[in-house]
C-alpha cells in the first residue's frame, strides 16, 4: 500500500477536530503533517520573524505532501487556510475536505 503524505490545514480554533482527524487519518495508513499549535498564550508574544517562519514551514509541509486536508468545520475556511488551499492548488496537490469525511 502506498502511503499518502497529507498536510492538515485549518483554523486553530478547531484544534480538537484537527487532532482527532489527524489521528484517524494516521490510523488508516496516512502520514500526517499537522500544523504547529502556538504554545505562547499571548499571540503577540511571537515576533514577526517567528510568525513568518511558522508560516513558511507550513508551506514546506504542503510542498512535501501528496495532498492537504482542510479541516473546515461547519464549512468555515478562514483567510489563512484559503491561501494554503490556493498554494496547494498551484502545486497540483490533491485537496481533501473534512466535511466530505463526516457525511
What are these regions (language model features)?
Residues 1-103:
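Conserved catalytic or regulatory cores that recognize and/or transform ribose-phosphate-containing ligands
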Amino acid at each position: 500500500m502506498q502511503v499518502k503524505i497529507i498536510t492538515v490545514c485549518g483554523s486553530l480554533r478547531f484544534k480538537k477536530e484537527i487532532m482527532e482527524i489527524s489521528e484517524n487519518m494516521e490510523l488508516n495508513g496516512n502520514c500526517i503533517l499537522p500544523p504547529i499549535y502556538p504554545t505562547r498564550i499571548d499571540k503577540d508574544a511571537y515576533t514577526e520573524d517567528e510568525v513568518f517562519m511558522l508560516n513558511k514551514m507550513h508551506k514546506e509541509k504542503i510542498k512535501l505532501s501528496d495532498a492537504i486536508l482542510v479541516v473546515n468545520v461547519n464549512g468555515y475556511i478562514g483567510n489563512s487556510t484559503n491561501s494554503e488551499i490556493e498554494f496547494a492548488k498551484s502545486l497540483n496537490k490533491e485537496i481533501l475536505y473534512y466535511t466530505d469525511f463526516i457525511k
